[in-house]
């Protein structure tokens, strides 16, 4: 929202005094703030033409489990509630949500326009919607990046690629039996939409056998774990790889879908501890760590070659050392969130890819949209305009592709646009 404010002011010439910015830490405070603004604006504005030149840009505050927060503030969480809930907290939440919806509907009835960002509101249709990446899309994106990097289409059942999926969620306990697992479920749905054909054809397998050819999109719990503590992430991976049984014989691993950068960082730390060596750069012989650094600093471009097939297991004792060395090669690790703290691992190849919203483009798009809504109201000639069904109604939307980021495009996607500096990338 702050980015949009700057774009509205700097790129469109709107005066700072005509822009009001409010922030809130929860839905209750936000609904009160929006309600107060709308009522005060209506009471303080006599002419309907002035109201028609007012646009509210609202990013509804979503309450979510801690594991969902690991994806950052921009991942989509649709806001729903039960008006007839018996639980007091749920009643308060429903009241706050309904207050926000009522305030926005009142604004629209008075001629104001409403732009909703990321999180939809149950039963409410805005004038404009700005969707962010949903859980299913995040899962699908990472799975596709993994499939492409490992060239699973060229794999065979004789030498399947070994893949683990670590799906973080908040396990319900006695104090919180109502923990929402929908984000984790939809994340796996997106992952499995991409990976299922390869597991069925025998081109992919799971060393831990948590995923098999008979796995369905509903079997998310088979790969889910409580990610509330870093040590839990590491112990889950070690258990999957049977590291507690025999550290001297590493398990061959081609790829890990970590779901977000917080998990990816802990996965990389544990793999390092378990003796895995190299980096994802080693999977493509034409890319070295120095080559990655040179590319980011502008000295040369990267070239890609095919991913080599994993070595087949040898039955000869004489080849055991060679097998162990091959098995201990660093796998592809995916994540999401583009944490600044994860950038050094992207550069050194410990984490192959991450992803994030194109925030600068979205902020600029929102700014242009607000000015158009307050003037001509015509949006059709803007290149980023699309349409989608929101709460049963066809709504105009803003569309920007999610940025998939790896070492070979980090300079173009993050450094040149100014999201991060060379120092942030550890250079």
Regions found by a protein language model. Give the residues of each.
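Short, small-residue-biased leader/transition segments that mark boundaries at the very start
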Residues: 1-8
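Short beta->alpha junction loops
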Residues: 18-29, 33, 212-232
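Hydrophobic alpha-helical
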Residues: 58-73, 90-106, 191, 215-343
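Flexible loop/hinge segments that line or gate small-molecule binding clefts
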Residues: 70-93, 100-136, 166-168, 342-347
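Short beta-strand elements at the ligand-binding edges of bilobed clamshell
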Residues: 85-95, 122-148, 176-183, 348-360
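Hydrophobic alpha-helical segments within soluble ligand-binding/sensing domains
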Residues: 104, 130-163, 186, 230-237, ...
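Hinge/cleft segment of the Venus flytrap/periplasmic-binding protein
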Residues: 176-179, 309, 338, 358-427
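Extracellular/periplasmic ligand-binding modules, especially the Venus flytrap/periplasmic-binding
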Residues: 253-271, 343-347, 353-378
